[in-house]
């Protein structure tokens, strides 16, 4: 049985090596993906209320796909940009 819709890629695909090219370290990747996943989750939560404060997923999604998997695919596709936050001046 063949289908034109591919299965969700999940957290193991895209590979971590490709994702690390978008950030300085694995720690910044975790923060980057977590923030975007929270935005996606908030977007889905506010849809029922008619508010559009957050931007929805920038890649095609599947019904049961988790926000973190969507965020990682967006980062891998180069659809998001991150900016370094300066620490407090001493």
UniProtKB/Swiss-Prot annotation:
GO CC terms in record = cytosolic DNA-directed RNA polymerase complex
Annotated keywords: DNA-directed RNA polymerase, Nucleotidyltransferase, Transcription, Transferase
Enumerate the Pfam families for this protein.
RNA_pol_Rpb6
SMART domains with a match to the protein in the record: RNA_pol_Rpb6
The record's GO molecular-function terms, alphabetically, read: bacterial-type RNA polymerase core enzyme binding; DNA binding; DNA-directed RNA polymerase activity
EC numbers listed for it are 2.7.7.6
Q: Does the keyword Membrane apply?
A: no
GO BP terms, alphabetized: DNA-templated transcription initiation
Name the source's superkingdom: Bacteria
Q: Could you confirm whether the keyword Nucleotidyltransferase appears in this record?
A: yes
Q: Which reaction does it catalyse?
A: RNA(n) + a ribonucleoside 5'-triphosphate = RNA(n+1) + diphosphate
Q: What does this protein do?
A: Promotes RNA polymerase assembly. Latches the N- and C-terminal regions of the beta' subunit thereby facilitating its interaction with the beta and alpha subunits.
The family line of this record is: Belongs to the RNA polymerase subunit omega family.
Classification via HAMAP family: RNApol_bact_RpoZ
Supply the name of the protein. Answer: DNA-directed RNA polymerase subunit omega
């Amino acid at each position: 049985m063949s289908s034109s819709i591919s299965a969700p890629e999940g957290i193991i695909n895209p590979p971590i090596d490709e994702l690390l090219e978008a950030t300085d370290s694995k720690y910044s990747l975790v923060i980057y993906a977590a923030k975007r996943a929270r935005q996606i989750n908030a977007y889905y939560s506010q849809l029922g209320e008619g508010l559009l404060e957050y931007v929805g997923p920038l890649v095609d999604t599947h019904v049961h796909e988790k926000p973190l998997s969507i965020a990682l695919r967006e980062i891998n596709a180069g659809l998001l940009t991150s900016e370094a936050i300066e620490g407090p001046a001493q």
